[in-house]
Amino acid sequence: MEEAAHVKAELRLGTAGWNVPRVWKERVGGVGSQLERYARVLNATEINSSFHKPHRRSTYEKWANATPDDFRFSVKVPKSVTHSSQLAQGELDRFVEESAGLGAKLGVLLVQFAPRKMFVESDAEFLFRALQERTSAALACEPRHVSWFTSEVGAWLRERRIARVAADPARVPDADLPGGWPGLRYFRLHGAPRIYYSAYDGAFLRSLKVRLGAASSSSETWCIFDNTAAGAAIENALDLLA
């Protein structure tokens, strides 16, 4: 596969999934599958479906083979692992083995916690250590409880090389700012004011572009648009490239 040429190497830009609505197919044209066409324009994607159901290793291998050498995937850790009161080690082992089918194109494992999941050091230590013992992929977490957004927890994440997602809209103060390990900056844009549906306007995208430029000058930086419900994600990602 030829390498994606439209995005600077230090910035990973994409959407959650790679569905391209018909209205945007002229901007993401050419031959091939939706993923092949998508990957000619954007250099990253986030696989969210893994949160709800497993995929075969052969499916991950197929996705990897459909993309350029420089393309990278972020994969969301299953909710059976992140939303359980006890770590489901069998589920985690299966997920890691399956997603390893992406090979070198596996860039990040994304851990999203339930909104009521408080920071409990022993629980967090157990989960993140289990992940890091099984994979060399970078880790990003998206907590949604206020207890995760303290300087002490930020330092705890930094020490363990775990990035904290910058999520918009912010559920709690500072949730829209990247935190934790500074070697990875991961932005997730869910859509505002209507989450998953609303497109971001030009003023927001211009401001975001400045933030991404500053972040990517010193860190691997990901920007994933998750406002996919009405097709706004691909529009916003393409406009950010313009």
Where are the regions a protein language model picked out?
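Residues lining hydrophobic/aromatic ligand-binding pockets adjacent to catalytic sites
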Residues: 1-242
